[in-house]
């Protein structure tokens, strides 16, 4: 419906609370509490239109982790945009996540859409807007800045912490809610500033397909059938795998 992720939490409250407990088991209570605090502070000054929705979810769940898990982007995944078909594999190191997946039906200003998601998660990672487009979000490579992976990761986190642009998962949800068609979605995902690099895969109902490779304020678009994991298809941008080769 039109009530968003907060309403989904009300409909599936036990599943949402189970997600928070899975986060605690995977990351430990102290780590989750610290990242939740930092995430809450960042979202408070972020331009995301969904920050208040996350606040409502956190208040309803009354558990540590809602803010952190909503801006967590530490996953690996593979997507293929082949004509009118979007293929998606999720190989995330988050035990138990698959059992909590739901398909939620939403209504945006541009029409209805289906969100493959989890109760308590506000953004969109994989979705379908019938008659308009389907799309998925993958994590981009980590930029090469030094020869030491932890140092590069820390530099990127500090850069993200200073950004006011919306997270990529929030932009993808906004596209599903407001983009009129495939071309409109591509333009939106190509041009809207985001907080960190990302990879968007899209297909359209008339055989269209595209991969949108994004940095914070720049983009490279590949039209036609492509497969992308967590590496750049272009040869202009450098990057390193994030623990899993792709």
Kindly give the residue locations of the regions a language model identified:
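C-terminal, well-structured catalytic/ligand-binding subdomain of enzymes
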Residues: 1-63, 85, 89-246
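Short, glycine/charge-rich beta-strand/loop segments that flank catalytic centers
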Residues: 64-80
């Amino acid at each position: 419906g039109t009530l968003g992720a907060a309403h989904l939490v009300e409909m599936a409250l036990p599943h949402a609370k189970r997600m928070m407990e899975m986060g605690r088991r995977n990351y430990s209570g102290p780590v989750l509490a610290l990242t939740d605090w930092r995430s809450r502070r960042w979202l408070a000054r972020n331009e995301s239109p969904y920050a208040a929705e996350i606040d409502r979810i956190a208040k309803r769940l009354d558990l540590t982790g809602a803010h952190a898990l909503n801006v967590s982007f530490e996953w690996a995944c593979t997507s293929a945009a082949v004509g009118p078909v979007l293929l998606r594999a999720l190989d995330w190191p988050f035990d138990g996540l698959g059992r909590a997946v739901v398909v939620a039906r939403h209504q945006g200003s541009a029409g209805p859409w289906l969100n493959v998601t989890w109760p308590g998660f506000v953004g969109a990672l994989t979705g379908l807007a019938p008659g308009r487009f389907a799309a998925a979000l993958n994590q981009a490579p980590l930029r090469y800045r030094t020869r030491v992976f932890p140092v590069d990761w820390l530099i990127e986190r500090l850069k993200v912490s200073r950004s006011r642009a919306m997270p990529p998962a929030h932009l993808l949800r906004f596209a599903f809610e407001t983009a009129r068609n495939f071309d409109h979605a591509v333009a939106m995902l190509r041009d809207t500033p985001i907080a960190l690099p990302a990879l968007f895969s899209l297909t359209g109902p008339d055989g269209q397909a595209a991969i949108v490779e994004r940095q914070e304020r720049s983009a490279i678009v590949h039209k036609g059938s492509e497969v992308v994991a967590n590496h750049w298809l272009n040869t202009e941008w450098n990057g390193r795998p994030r623990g899993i080769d792709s």
